[in-house]
Amino acid sequence: MQRINWIDWAKALAVMSVVFCHLPQSQEWFYYRYLQALTMVIFFFISGYLKKDRGSDKENWKKYWYGLVIPYIIYNVAVYPYWLVKYYLSSGAMPDLFHALSPLLGALLLEHENEFCEPLNGPLWYLPAILIMHIIIDMCRKTKYQHWIMISLCIISFFLYTANKYWYFAPNLTPIGLMRNLPYYYMGYLFGQYHLFRNIDFKQDAIGCFAFMTFSILFFAWHLNAFYSDQHILHIVLFYPANICFIFGVLYGCKVLNRFKSPMITNISIGTLVIVGLHIVLVTIINFSIEHLLHISGTICYKWYEALPIAILIVAILYPLIIWSIKQCPILVGKEGYSWYKKETLY
């Protein structure tokens, strides 16, 4: 399948934003809360946009197994030794059996968090969420009411997410992410199925990027103001147009960048799973090192101009592993074998 350059740009920028947002920064800074709240919708929209019907449940599940299930298992297993070291450094002793099993149980429960378990590799929550969305779409396709069912589920997810923001009944992390992001996934799916959003026009795309990003920022500022004013319903309702405008603002911006074909961006896009699965380890190591070198008591808090080069450094450290994975171990980037990149050029 021929790669879509503007989608590679979107995935690469989104995954670098994920790394940036996992570097501790003050919640008082608007840009940080904005990116924290909105970045993940890019992945869900693109996942829906690229969703294909492979003709049979067997072929669909083969794709899900290699692209979502196995990477979820691998990257959870890979970070468990890191979790043990982190526990030892923070408590001064190795965990007992109960605490040692806690993150493993959390991973089995899709990065669940409660008094008995905790997420082992929290950033991976979106993989089971996307898997569930794919399965829902596949099931709905077998009926003649697929779009009515999906629209109904999106409406239900909105009300569940709204209720959960008030009563906090849904477990973290995957169920909340599923309720929150299903509408954006379905929107992407519709755009992909009906071949929408494919034309490239530099001037129109630049105007679209500026307009949608401006509206997104305004909606998000209003969304935060509603929260501080205890306007619960308005706070939730405004979150959706902020996200939708963000999606189109970012994607129009990536269409502007479509004229620039960068092999590094392509490889980062292909290696999204590597970065999502392993960056949290590097974030912790860098935070720990800087805190001790600078004798910082408590948790370090970066400014944006400090966090940005660190995020780029983390991606750069993982980049050789991405290249190796593409060439030698495709399962780490969610691929079955070598044939998928025969027509790709690696740099």
What do the predicted segments below correspond to?
Residues 1-347:
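Alpha-helical transmembrane segments and their immediate juxtamembrane cytosolic regions
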